[in-house]
Amino acid sequence: MRNHFLTLYKLRDRDGVTAIVVGIMLAILLGFAAFAIDIGYSRVTKNELQNIADGAALASARQLGVIYETMSPSEIRSYDASADEVTLKDIAKDVADQSKAGGKGNIIINDDDIVIGSWDASASPPFSPTVSSPNAVQVTARRDSISNGPISTFFARIFGINTSDVTADATAALTGQGTAEEGGLPLPVGISRAWFLNKEEFCDQPIKFYPTGDSEGCAGWNVYTETPSSASNLRDILDDLASGDYESPETIAGKTEFDFTGGNVATAFSDMKALFDVMKIKNDGILDKDDDSNTWTATVPVYDWADCSNPNDDIPIIGFTTVVIEEVLESPTHTINARVTCDNIETARGGGPSYGTWGSIPGLVE
């Protein structure tokens, strides 16, 4: 009998210990569940704030691109955004005002959380505030004590945590032109990436488009995406460009390949001269981007070539730049002299490397 009561006592003792352990485990599980639910809600809210910050930064930077579209390179270089700062910030605020995050609508973004500046991927840090020729906008969207109030917790308040701060940042910038629409490349020549890599400063530097194949003429003639890549076909394209019967194809950096002729284009020189004579007097802002009837300013592609030798292959286009053809000298020199210009804006998407020409349609960079 004594052993029986002793056994019952031990069982009751074990039950008590088990109850304590179960109670502790339930508390721990409840804690994990509480934090899991609240962390999940916080992440959903952060995603919503991120979308708001992204949209606000893109909208404001796009307005910056629109402003630049009406300017010459010299005006872009001297542009001070102070006069447009209120407009740029209001555009970002309007995007947020039409959005909600964490169940709250009409999100407010403070002036201090919208910063106009410059983005340079090679710099550290890459974004710096400035109103002098800016190319980027940085936006912070908040649910905290500074703006819109923190989000409320569900179960974490059991542990004394009643609210949580959530923020999201985004930077949108005008970057190197990444696309050229149909007809946007009226000159069937490109510049090797080697020309840019070999120069500490390439802005306003001279380059020859004829003859090519050396450091001074680090360029190549092409027939766009046509075949064959012959001087005869190049002549036909030059003639059709001059008469308005041909338009260059839509070109996307990193995707499109052009067929380069290899430098044997002497028979096409007179056709090059004829195209120059037609284009230099257009001054239409499209085919000829200047107002000087003695020069021809146009966008040309940059092709992926390791040196300045004459290219003879289907070669990927990796970006775009703007050139001014200043003179085409006939016999006896047979020379086409040009220079690369910087601080140009094209109504096109960015996303490409920087070769002196930006796209006015921004992208998210951070």
Residue map of PLM features:
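Surface-exposed patches in mature extracellular/periplasmic domains of secreted proteins
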Residues: 67-72, 101-113
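Alpha-helical assembly-interface signal, strongest on the long, hydrophobic N-terminal helix that forms
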Residues: 2-94, 201
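N-linked glycosylation sequons
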Residues: 71-93, 108-110, 120-366
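Structured segments of extracytoplasmic/periplasmic soluble domains
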Residues: 59-63, 91-103, 142, 173
